[in-house]
Amino acid sequence: MGLTDIFLNLLLFVYPAVFIIYQIILYEISARKQINQEALKYSNLPVLSIIVPIKNEEISVIQGLLDNLSNLIWDKKKLEIIIVSDDNEDYFTKIINTVKVPKDLTVYFYRREKKLGYKSGALQYGFEKATGDLILTIDVDSRLPPNALINAYEKMQSNTCDAIVFQWNGYSSNQYSTLAKGMVVSTLFASKALFEGKEKLKLKIYPVGSGTMFSREALRVVNGWDYRLVQDDLEIGTRLIYNGKNVCASGIPIYVEVPDNFYSFYVQQTRWAMGSAEVLRNRLKYIIKSKISFTQRMDLIIYLLQYTPVIVTFFISTLLSLMLPFRIGHDPLNSPALLFWLVSLGLYASLLLSLALKLGLNLKDSLMGIGRLTAFTVSISPFIVFNFFKGLLKSGNTYVITPKGTVKKTNKLLRIIAIIGVFGLLYLLSSILYIYEGYYVTGIWLLYYSSAYLYTMLLYYKEL
């Protein structure tokens, strides 16, 4: 095996496996961290402002959030809800006239006339209107348990936190969505690993867009959100850390709605890929110059590179497909690195399956959910690549809101599926030719890789 093949195998198998094993380690460490979630009583609570950006949201969803917030344990005289709308004037008026505000809540509705940026701009607008010493950002379809706020505040006080992150627990109102079941499992797994696991290792934590409580002073120091960038949470997180602010994990759940159809999943993941790359481009200097340890800096950068294993795998798989006509003379993937990748993937899958069963899913739903999520993730690799480099090369990108509910077969969706199908057939044809030439390992690998694309092309309609 030559140096080129060694490098190829390191990128294709070892590089993604390292990311997988790192997340496994963080998840296992998070399981050892016990967090007190008993409701605490405070007689002198600060004013808390909850900022909720909305656009084209169903009124029933807005009503559901307000009803949920009215049940939270907090001095309601010291609680204000700030809803920032980017809707047109007619729909905004309809919202105000239709929503029934619970009697004990103070709710302010604002419509942005001058729409600077997207979600980041809406959060900054809300921050400028807020009067609270604490600022909580939350999506309109997220929900909190009754003791969430007061427990989070207690930890902020006891651990001297400038911001505290709630633990993402996925939910879906679509009980028939196999994708949503897989998303619920992976969301909780990632949340435990990336928040509680990192805190246990004394690594730095990024805020999340829905479910972070900030001190007003911390936001003041960094001048709030930068409306020019798409990924509001990662963007502000780098500047908070640069300014020496402490972001903590609470271990307290917030229930966030997960995508329940292919197109919503596609929009969410491609936006996150673009956003993380955009932050990498614009905020890397803040990470490098932060007065934190080398390990902490590297971990923050690795988090922003979380989509690169998908990107590297796509490039190498495509390269392998195009190499065959040149008669390479040997099996390029016949390497022990493949075994390392298989073991890491097996461990990861077993942990996801175990978590799915703990969450109450039966074995069939668990396997189907994890499998469908995996296939969809692989199949959108070309679009992850495009959007990652789009974010890396320029700022001022468009924030596309994750659509909810039933999705129609639009021309855009059909184009996406067509592109997925073309790549799937390319990898399938290449796998057959590699096997025919006697390069069995590479051929089987490409057959495996093509299956995700072909599966999505043939079955995506079941998740619409």
From Swiss-Prot:
Topology in the lipid bilayer: Multi-pass membrane protein
E.C. numbers: 2.4.-.-
Signal peptide start-end: none
Subcellular location(s) per record: Cell membrane
GO terms under biological process: biosynthetic process
Cellular component, GO, one term: membrane
Top-level taxon: Archaea
Keyword Transferase: yes
First-level EC class: transferase
Molecular function via GO: glycosyltransferase activity
Null allele phenotype: Essential, it cannot be deleted.
Any Pfam family matching the protein: Glycos_transf_2
Spans through the membrane: 6-26, 300-320, 337-357, 373-393, 416-436, 439-459
CDD domains according to UniProt: CESA_like
Keywords from the named record: Cell membrane, DNA damage, Glycosyltransferase, Membrane, Transferase, Transmembrane, Transmembrane helix
Database matches in InterPro entries: Glyco_trans_2-like, Glycosyltr_2/OpgH_subfam, Nucleotide-diphossugar_trans
UniProt similarity note: Belongs to the glycosyltransferase 2 family.
Role this protein plays: Probably part of a 4-gene DNA damage response locus in which the upstream ups system, in combination with this downstream locus, functions in homologous recombination to rescue Sulfolobales from DNA-damaging threats.
Name assigned to this protein: Probable glycosyltransferase Saci_1499
Organism: Sulfolobus acidocaldarius (strain ATCC 33909 / DSM 639 / JCM 8929 / NBRC 15157 / NCIMB 11770)
